[in-house]
Amino acid sequence: VVAPAGLKPLAETECVFCGQCVQACPVGALSEIDNKYPVWRALNDPSKTVVVQTAPAVRVAIGECFGLEPGSISTGKMVTALRMLGFDKVFDTDFAADLTIMEETTELIERVKKNEKLPILTSCCPGWVKFLEHQFPELLYMPSSAKSPQQMFGAIAKSYYAQKIGVAPENLVVVSVMPCLSKKYEASREEFSHDGVRDVDIVISTRELADMIREAGIRFEQLEEQEYDSPLGESTGAAVIFG
């Protein structure tokens, strides 16, 4: 019998939205959610300002999709490709990762001073968070209250940045390019929406970005290198280890 663990219906499993079931299903009954077309629609909507953030791991993995040596860092080519696809601004999730580090450090200092809610647990992985919620609900006081870099970026983009460029939050579309499918689930959580407007509107995987680049007829390996946009494209080296 082919079924989830414990023969439970899929909707009743303690799913952490990692996406591995798609790869492991022996009969090919599952498929990932494809978010390329919502991105294309946003890019072709003249009423929307569309910005994109890319996770650190994407700049390495994207090169392999186009035949570059494994481990090749393709940051500049990736930024160029994203601009050619039509994104108004290309930003780096590392900017928000630096903020996450500062927020978590501040929170740890306060907890140590008050000697409460220790130890502090931290992870930007939504699968890990969901696993904790499923398996260890009695420990939910331990994780840091800081958002993941993806969600912190979205919150900043829909507030500070939207105000800075004079665009209403509902007309600013934030797209994330992430190495993990669970980031799609994270962006959909209720606590990351305000007045019906999501902090991060659409999440695509590295492979989906590669598909979009091919669909646009872009020769990735031949691209010149460009830099991220300012101010949300600036970061320190410490942020890169978030992945």
Residue ranges, per PLM feature:
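Short helix/strand-bridging catalytic loops that position acidic/His residues to coordinate divalent metals
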Residues: 2-9, 138-144
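Immediate flanking context of iron-sulfur cluster ligation sites
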Residues: 5-16, 167-177
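Iron-sulfur-associated redox domains of electron-transfer enzymes in respiratory
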Residues: 32-243
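Iron-sulfur cluster-binding cysteine motifs and their immediate structural context
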Residues: 1, 14-38
